[in-house]
Amino acid sequence: MEAAIEFDEIVKKLLNIYINDICTMGEKRLLNNYEKSILDRIYKSCEYIKKNYELDFNSMYNQININDITTSDIKSKIIESLLIDSRPSVKLATLSFISLIAEKWGEKNRTKIMEILSNEIVEKISNNGKDFIDFIDRDDDDIVDDYVLITNYLKITIFGAILGITAYYICKYLLKSIF
């Protein structure tokens, strides 16, 4: 009986993934060729960043989990970093990190992921869209050097954010215990 329930859950999970994929494919069919090529470059660029900086991103992700940082804290730090530096390479590195979070959180946490990738962040990333498109259309060799610099910047920003948020919660806890 238990085995049948496990199979039911597996099929249920797979059907949900299938339907989500079909919906996404339907949205992709509505794109023109130019939009499809840009989307393809975004995919490739983000995958390149995630693959080459997997250890750094995983370390940043683990810090988020260890410190139990809320989605609103993550979102506010991402917005803050995009306000400080709005270069297309920073935007792409940020998007790559968000996509890594989405992969790790999976379907169960879709609403949490969408809280992070709010309209405000989408607006910040898509602002100056021509520069963003020009950046992802460059040759891969030109982009590599920018990714190294940007990933280091993003790593410092996220770790700084984590330290700041952790310090905030520690101070809050200490003040509560004192008073």
Curated annotation (Swiss-Prot):
The lineage of its organism: Viruses, Varidnaviria, Bamfordvirae, Nucleocytoviricota, Pokkesviricetes. It holds the Pfam family M11L. It is a single-pass membrane protein. It comes from Deerpox virus (strain Mule deer/United States/W-848-83/1983) (DPV). The chain crosses the membrane at residues 148-170. It comes from the Viruses. Interacts with host BAX and BAK1. InterPro entries: Bcl-2-like_sf, Poxvirus_F1/C10. Keywords: Host membrane, Host mitochondrion, Host-virus interaction, Inhibition of host apoptosis by viral BCL2-like protein, Membrane, Modulation of host cell apoptosis by virus, Transmembrane, Transmembrane helix. It is found in: Host mitochondrion; Host membrane. Plays a role in the inhibition of host apoptosis by sequestering and inactivating several proapoptotic BCL-2 proteins, including BAK1 and BAX. Prevents the conformational activation of both of them. This is Apoptosis regulator DPV022. One of its GO terms (cellular component) is host cell membrane. GO terms for biological process: regulation of apoptotic process; symbiont-mediated suppression of host apoptosis.
